[in-house]
Structure formats: C-alpha cells, structure tokens
C-alpha cells in the first residue's frame, strides 16, 4: 500500500480563514499586552513556608497556574459586554480536551472560534520551551477533517518566579510573573519547526523551540499532509498503522 493510493477526504477551508486566524491571534495578543501594560501580570502564591517556594520544582505547578491566569484574564474581558475585542464567549476545557480554553469573537456578522492551547515556559530554566507536546497526532488530524476552519492557537507564556516577604504575615510569598508571550496558529507554523514524537498513543505533535517559531502559509489539506508525512517518517510507524488510524478516524472516503 502507498500513501498516494489512499482515497482521502480533502478538507477545504473558507477563503476568509487567513483573515479570521490573524484576527484571533491579534486580539489574543492585544488582550494580554494590555493586561501586562496595566501591571496585572503576576500570580501571588501565599504559603506558610518560612523559606518560600521550592523554586527548583516550581515548573511542576506553573502550567496549571498560568493557564488559570489566562482563563481569568479572558473571562474578565468577556464579562464586559461592550469590550473592544468583541470577545463574547470563554470556556475552560477539561484536562484531556484538545485545547485548554475556547475563545469566541464576534467579527462582523460571524462568530470566530479559537481553540487555545496554553503552554507555560520558564525564563529561569534554559531548555524550557524545547519540544513541548502540543497535541495528539490523530486528534488534531481529525479536527482538521471535521472542521476545515478549525483554528488551533498555541499561546506560549514565559514566566519567572521569585520570592518576596509578605509585610503583613512576615512569610515568603511566591511571585509568578509573566515575562513574555507569543501567539501562533498551528496550521501556519513552518515545516521545520514542527516535529513528531511517536510516544504516547498515536504520537505527539511538538514544536522544536516554542520561543523561536517561523511561519508558513498553507491550506488545511496541506497541513493534514504535513502531519501525515511527520507520522510516516518515524521509524516506529508504518503505512499499515497509518491506514488503520485513517480508517478509524474517518479520514478516508467511504
């Protein structure tokens, strides 16, 4: 069996997809930039530890904390019905969902949905942000087939952690401060920046270095083909495994 012989369903996105993607990216970036400019860029962790937080292990809780901060920021904007970003809906997703947060923006007469995956990286750890797992190969491949206009956003948030004595309790508070952030549409990340790790189920799509990403315009079908190529180039995968996965997830025409 050859890849070229498989009768795939070919997803075709709207011609307006690039504009909608750019709109979602710009609004997310603008919201977070404004939040940081206002000084609301810190998570304060109160503890009863006299020496403060164990900074060498703080990255273990950073992900959920940063994700909760981002969801709270977006929800605060949504609660203002006249917000300048036309953000009309925010939904935090379950732990095993394809994304962490769903954002919906009103754009003219359309509602545009961004599926946001929040990735926390540490400014204090040299290799933080290198090859993070983004999503399951089969899950994202299926999402693009089911909805050719599926917008999967990677929100990379870099933080730094330090301790500061609380003048009221005289104990040490942990301060998790947002240092920088970037917003990407997975579909437009360059071929050279995307990698595939066969570990965990059908494998994980990874970004080689989430802090340094270049862009490359492509269609939804081209993205599906790129994902397939990454999968099939793995020495631990075969065309037979791929075909079975394609049948199971209905990527092939009946």
From Swiss-Prot:
Keywords: Endonuclease, Hydrolase, Nuclease, Restriction system
E.C. no: 3.1.21.4
Catalytic function, reaction form: Endonucleolytic cleavage of DNA to give specific double-stranded fragments with terminal 5'-phosphates
GO biological process, one term: DNA restriction-modification system
Top-rank lineage group of the source organism: Bacteria
GO molecular function: type II site-specific deoxyribonuclease activity
Protein name: Type II restriction enzyme HpaI
Species of provenance: Haemophilus parainfluenzae
Gene expressing this chain: hpaIR
